[in-house]
Amino acid sequence: MKAGIHPEYKAVNATCSCGNSFVFNSTLDKESIHLDVCDKCHPFYTGKQRIVDTGGRVDRFNKRFGALSSGKK
């Protein structure tokens, strides 16, 4: 293989919004990243029913189509 063409492989610290943090190896240029959900707080892994709303998408949907589900016209 050619020398000097491969990206640097280093440790990256990932921090979740729930407070969980872990280190993994990656070719990212950043030393740390922030996550919205991880395996400790994701509804699929915890078994708890929870809506993960990023950017108000659920509110926007309910504002546009909420009248249809409530029977109002």
Curated annotation (Swiss-Prot):
Binds 1 zinc ion per subunit. Pfam families: Ribosomal_L31 (PF01197). The keyword NAD does not apply. It comes from the Bacteria. GO terms for cellular component: ribonucleoprotein complex; ribosome. Its cofactor is Zn(2+). The keyword Zinc applies. Keywords: Metal-binding, Ribonucleoprotein, Ribosomal protein, RNA-binding, rRNA-binding, Zinc. PROSITE patterns: RIBOSOMAL_L31. Part of the 50S ribosomal subunit. Belongs to the bacterial ribosomal protein bL31 family. Type A subfamily. This is Large ribosomal subunit protein bL31. It comes from Vibrio vulnificus (strain CMCP6). The gene is rpmE.
